[in-house]
Regions:
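N-terminal nicking endonuclease/strand-transfer module with a His-rich metal-binding environment
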Residues: 2-252
Length: 252
C-alpha cells in the first residue's frame, strides 16, 4: 500500500515535501500539496475483505489504535441496488456471484491535502465522486483515513474508494441475479450492465490520463480557494509559490 500504517504489514512510506514557513509569529511547517491517484482492481474473493479493511470493521477494528490513525469519514454505500440493506451484503454478493476472473471492484486511492480541515477533505472527495462515480450509478463505498507519517510525523490524509462496474439501473434483482450477464433485449431478465471505465474514451490508457487530469483540476481549484500559496525561506528570503499539483508528476 502507498499509505503506511505502523504495525500493519503494509510496506512503503509516504511523506509530503516539507517547507519551513518563516514568520515572526509562527515557525510551523507547511506543506506543498501532493499528487497521488492510483487505480487498482481485484477479482472476486477480495471485495468483502477490502470493504472491511477500509471501513475498519471486524478484524480491522484494531488498526485505529495500533497506527494512531483517525478515520475521518466512512461512506458505507452509495448507488447500491435495492437488495442491499447493508453494504457488507453487496460486497459479499460480488465475491459470491461475480463470474470467474471478473473484477469484483475497482479502487481509487487518493492523497488529500493535510492543510484542509476534515470537512473540507470530505467535501473535496464528495464533489469529485458526484461528477465521476454517481452519474454512472456505480455502487460504491469509501473511507477517508488520516495516519501520521512514520518518517516525518506529518498527517497523511487519503481516501480509499471501491466501486463495482455493475451499474445500478434501478431494476429489482436478487443478489445472485444482479451479477449475472446483462440481457440487452430484456434487462430485467439478466444482471446489471457493466459500464467499463474506458466507455466514451479511446481505450483504458486514455481513460487513466483523463481521470488523473480531472483530479488534478479538481484539487487545484480547491487549493486555489482554501490555501492558494505556500511561503518558505531560501537564503533568508521569503519566497511565495502557488500551491498546486500536477498529474504529470505522478509515478505510474
Amino acid at each position: 500500500g502507498f499509505f503506511s500504517h505502523p504495525g500493519i504489514p503494509n510496506p512503503g512510506g509516504f511523506h509530503l515535501v516539507s517547507l519551513h514557513k518563516n514568520r515572526s509569529q509562527t515557525n510551523k511547517k507547511v506543506n506543498m500539496a501532493s499528487y497521488h491517484f492510483s487505480v487498482k482492481s481485484k477479482n472476486k474473493g477480495y471485495a468483502l475483505g477490502h470493504y472491511l479493511y477500509i471501513s475498519r470493521l471486524m478484524q480491522y477494528e484494531g488498526i485505529r489504535k495500533t497506527s494512531n490513525e483517525t478515520v475521518e469519514h466512512i461512506e458505507p454505500g452509495r448507488c447500491m441496488p435495492s437488495f442491499v440493506k447493508d453494504p457488507i451484503e453487496f460486497w459479499q454478493a460480488a465475491d459470491t456471484y461475480e463470474r470467474a476472473n471478473a473484477k469484483a471492484y475497482i479502487e481509487y486511492e487518493i492523497a488529500l491535502p493535510n492543510e484542509f480541515t476534515p470537512e473540507q477533505r470530505k467535501t473535496l472527495i464528495e464533489t469529485f465522486f458526484d461528477k465521476h462515480i454517481v452519474p454512472q450509478q456505480y455502487p460504491h463505498s469509501y473511507a477517508i483515513h488520516n495516519v501520521k507519517s512514520r518518517i516525518s510525523g506529518e498527517d497523511q490524509p487519503h481516501c480509499h474508494l471501491m466501486f463495482s462496474l455493475k451499474a445500478n439501473d434501478g431494476i429489482e434483482r436478487t443478489a445472485e441475479q444482479y451479477f449475472k450477464r446483462y440481457n440487452p433485449k430484456d434487462p430485467s431478465k439478466g444482471g446489471a450492465k457493466k459500464i467499463q471505465l474506458q466507455d466514451g474514451h479511446a481505450d483504458y490508457s486514455t481513460f487513466l490520463i483523463y481521470i488523473r487530469k480531472q483530479w488534478e483540476n479538481h484539487l487545484n481549484d480547491a487549493l486555489a480557494q482554501h490555501c492558494p500559496t505556500v511561503t518558505y525561506t531560501l537564503d533568508g528570503q521569503d519566497i511565495t509559490i502557488k500551491n498546486q499539483v500536477s498529474a504529470d508528476s505522478y509515478e505510474k
